[in-house]
Amino acid sequence: MSTIKIKQVKSRIGAPADQKRVLDALGLRKMNRVVEHEATPSILGMVEKVKHLVAIVK
């Protein structure tokens, strides 16, 4: 599998609890932090749930 880099670009303040849990599971706790994960279906599904808060970095 390939890896993807995910960056949190918007604040989690005001986001529903389930979206905050997804950010925690991805390892994103602060703005502008970048994490690297394998591009598995579960990770891509989590990114889809919080796509308005994160960006995929090339």
UniProtKB/Swiss-Prot annotation:
Domain of life where this protein originates: Bacteria
UniProt cross-references to InterPro entries, sorted A to Z: Ribo_uL30_ferredoxin-like_sf, Ribosomal_uL30_bac-type, Ribosomal_uL30_ferredoxin-like
Record keyword Ribosomal protein present: yes
Keywords assigned: Ribonucleoprotein, Ribosomal protein
Any one cellular-component term (Gene Ontology): cytosolic large ribosomal subunit
One Pfam family of this chain: Ribosomal_L30
Entry GO MF terms: structural constituent of ribosome
UniProt entry tagged with the keyword Ribosomal protein: yes
Gene Ontology BP annotations: translation
Assembly behavior: Part of the 50S ribosomal subunit.
Family: Belongs to the universal ribosomal protein uL30 family.
Name of the protein in its database record: Large ribosomal subunit protein uL30
Organism name: Phocaeicola vulgatus (strain ATCC 8482 / DSM 1447 / JCM 5826 / CCUG 4940 / NBRC 14291 / NCTC 11154) (Bacteroides vulgatus)
